[in-house]
Amino acid sequence: PTLYERALEEAETFLKPGPQDRLVDLYCGTGTTLRRWLDSGARVMGVELAGEAVECARLNASEAVLLRGKCVERIPQLTAWLNEGGDWAGRRLLYVNPPRTGLEPEILAWTTDVARPERIAYLSCSAGTLSRNLAVLTESGYGVERITPYDFFPGTRHVETLVSLRRLGTV
């Protein structure tokens, strides 16, 4: 497998999505990750801004609920989807692969105060924004379980980092 596939395998092993779970995938790109979560049986919602990527995601993961636009503009729909049907036996899970700017403050607040996923897999391409985002998440009740660097671009100074976080007090 490629390094990217290994990173996704690690994320999936940590998240352990299943048929009872709802998984939100922010900055979902062309749907590669959506397909993976769907194949695990989870209910999946993705958000992506880029139009061509959204069209590819619709082809790659047609069963997923897919929203086009900025993640911050889709907070109402994300919240409604997570809450639809009232109580259910499954978990809330979050996978994010944001741009170099990291997670927007509104997305961080939504994550920690509204969505409150049991587990987060965060794939980052910027150590600086990752550090700032992790400070907020850990101050808000999340513990870092594992940090794995991936050299997707050998010969450059760019390193992708996968961080596995668990909400404190959850299994």
Per-region residue spans from a language model:
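Rossmann-like S-adenosyl-L-methionine
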Residues: P1-V171
